[in-house]
């Protein structure tokens, strides 16, 4: 069945704050003898575990930094997609503790929409996501789109969608330091360039034809993976508040110690990618099917890679070097990531079979255990069928 997607780009309204109380709180915060002000905004932010997920929650932490002391409280939870329902149930059980609940970079489905709509205080929840969504009519508190609201003809990410929301906030407007504003915008763009894999498609371009985000985006992701999460968030916040905000770039040939560390780690990652690709297992499948009254011979070639950590670079390099492969599966612990560069194949259909999701070219799902036999012929019959958008009754024989 054809996968149809209705994308909504609804404008979520601004954070609701009493401006008079905000000004009063700011004045009080300048007075040392005064006790801490009561919170004007109690926020919970639920997001994914990757760079885009943490990039979004870092923006909330930045927002809190510019509130008067004690005027905003923030609770964050970075989780796997399959934990969202349980997290929302717990959140709704304590909904009176929050004025605003933000969900970012976690795929929207009908179950989530129904859960939020059914709750009497569901209007406290704002959702920002860029994955494929099949829910036809999304409420106004959902911003779901694959397209960038800021950059024409570009793909977006959750960090950018959320940034587009909070930069209209009254408190954000109080950030008068233009260097800090530029740093935040640059950080958001680096996250977008990496999460959409835009940097990969421009890696062979002339350095004069692209901006520094294409260099800094993969370095930022490397930094994300080599640092403890709290260390990473702390480092990024310091970087964003610093007057020398270009510390991640190579502008005018000025290398910093962190740039060198990232380069060394990136070289290490490149060697790991090469090692993982050499371990790829090819799995050919041939099928005879009946569809639309005709006999079709399908011949798929799949590459399976078991890796310590999943990486789109591993899969995309594999597909680029092995043009005969129809799609590539990278298995890391109990996570399976699937990629394809063939226009006729939609790997998000594959991921849905196992309760996952994603995009046409890249998707993923979680399995309870990893075993090489999981990728045998019988297991992949339904995967092959779905990759070609076939019906189960169409399969006649498997050679």
Explain the meaning of each model-derived region.
Residues 223-224, 228-233, 238:
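Helix-loop-helix
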Residues 235-264:
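Long, charge-rich alpha-helical interaction segments
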Residues 234-239, 264-268, 306-312:
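Short N-terminal helix-initiation segments at or just after the protein's N-terminus
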Residues 19-22, 229-233, 254-258, 273:
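Short amphipathic alpha-helical segments that mediate assembly, nucleic-acid/protein binding
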């Amino acid at each position: 069945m054809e996968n149809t997607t209705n994308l909504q780009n609804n404008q979520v309204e601004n954070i609701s704050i009493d401006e008079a109380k905000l000004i009063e709180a700011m004045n009080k915060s300048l007075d040392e003898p005064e006790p801490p002000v009561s919170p004007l905004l109690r926020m919970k932010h639920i997001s994914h575990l990757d760079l885009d997920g943490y990039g979004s929650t870092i923006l909330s932490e930045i927002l809190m930094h510019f509130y008067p002391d004690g005027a905003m409280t923030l609770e964050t939870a970075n989780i796997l997609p399959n934990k969202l329902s349980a997290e929302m149930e717990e959140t709704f059980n304590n909904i009176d503790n929050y004025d605003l609940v933000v969900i970012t970079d976690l795929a929207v489905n009908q179950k989530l929409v129904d859960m939020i709509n059914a709750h009497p205080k569901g209007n406290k929840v704002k959702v920002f996501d860029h994955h494929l969504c099949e829910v036809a009519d999304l409420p106004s508190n959902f911003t779901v789109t694959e397209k960038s609201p800021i950059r024409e003809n570009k793909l977006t990410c959750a960090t950018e969608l959320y940034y587009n929301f909070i930069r209209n906030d009254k408190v954000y407007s109080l950030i008068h330091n233009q260097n800090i504003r530029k740093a935040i915008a640059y950080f958001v763009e680096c996250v977008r360039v990496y999460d959409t894999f835009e940097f990969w498609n421009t890696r062979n371009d002339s350095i004069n034809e692209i901006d520094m985000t294409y260099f800094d985006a993969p370095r930022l992701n490397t930094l994300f993976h080599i640092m403890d999460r709290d260390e990473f968030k702390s480092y990024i916040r310091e970087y964003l508040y610093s007057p020398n905000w270009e510390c991640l770039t190579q502008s005018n040939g000025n290398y910093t110690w962190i740039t060198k560390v990232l380069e060394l780690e990136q070289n290490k990652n490149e060697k790991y990618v090469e090692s993982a690709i050499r371990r790829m297992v090819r799995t050919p499948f041939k099928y005879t099917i009946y569809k639309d009254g005709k006999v079709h011979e399908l011949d798929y070639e799949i590459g399976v890679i078991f890796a310590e950590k999943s990486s789109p670079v591993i899969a995309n390099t594999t597909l680029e070097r092995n043009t005969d492969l129809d799609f590539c599966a990278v298995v890391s612990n109990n996570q399976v990531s699937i990629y394809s560069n063939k226009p006729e194949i939609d790997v998000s259909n594959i991921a849905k079979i196992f309760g996952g999701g994603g995009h046409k070219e890249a998707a993923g799902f979680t399995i309870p255990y990893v075993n090489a036999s999981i990728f045998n012929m019988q297991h992949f019959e339904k995967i092959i069928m779905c990759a070609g958008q076939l019906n189960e009754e169409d399969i006649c024989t498997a050679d």
